[in-house]
């Protein structure tokens, strides 16, 4: 199904997410109700779009979708999923991950501010 106000990038992301679980893109808040096997695959797709690409449009689309997810659930699973798909030695990927965390899970930044490092 084509959405009239969607960009080609959004259509691509929607298709990728909905391939895991039909209708998930438009109901992303329900991700917390899915079995972990499904919800973590969807979160991985979103993190990859938000951190691996070079084009700002899909990066921002994925960030926007991630911010729609319950923050408590997100805080529990972002570290686990990020370790599966982000190369922490790659400066680009790591910077995009930090930007994502600053927008979607700022609690991690706050925790770092209170560390002794």
What residue ranges belong to the model's regions?
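DNA-contacting interfaces and partner/effector-binding or oligomerization modules
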Residues: 1, 11-20
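Short active-site-adjacent helix-start/loop capping segments
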Residues: 40, 54-58
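Structural signature of alpha-solenoid helical repeat scaffolds
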Residues: 50-54, 85-89
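Short acidic, glycine/Ser/Thr-rich loop/turn "cap" segments at secondary-structure junctions
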Residues: 80-85, 92-96
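Structural detector for internal amphipathic alpha-helices that build alpha-solenoid repeat scaffolds
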Residues: 1-4, 22-37, 59-72, 91-104
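Amphipathic alpha-helical scaffolding segments comprising HEAT/armadillo-like alpha-solenoid repeats
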Residues: 6-14, 37-49, 71-84, 106-116
């Amino acid at each position: 199904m084509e959405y009239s106000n969607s960009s080609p990038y959004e259509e691509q992301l929607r298709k990728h997410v909905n391939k895991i679980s039909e209708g998930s893109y438009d109901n992303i808040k329900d991700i917390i109700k899915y079995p972990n096997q499904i919800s973590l695959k969807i979160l991985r797709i979103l993190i990859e779009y938000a951190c691996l690409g070079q084009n700002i449009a899909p990066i921002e689309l994925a960030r926007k979708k991630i911010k729609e997810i319950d923050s408590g659930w997100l805080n529990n699973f972002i570290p686990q999923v990020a370790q599966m798909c982000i190369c922490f030695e790659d400066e680009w990927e790591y910077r995009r991950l930090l930007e994502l965390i600053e927008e979607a899970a700022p609690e991690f930044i706050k925790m770092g501010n209170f560390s002794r490092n």
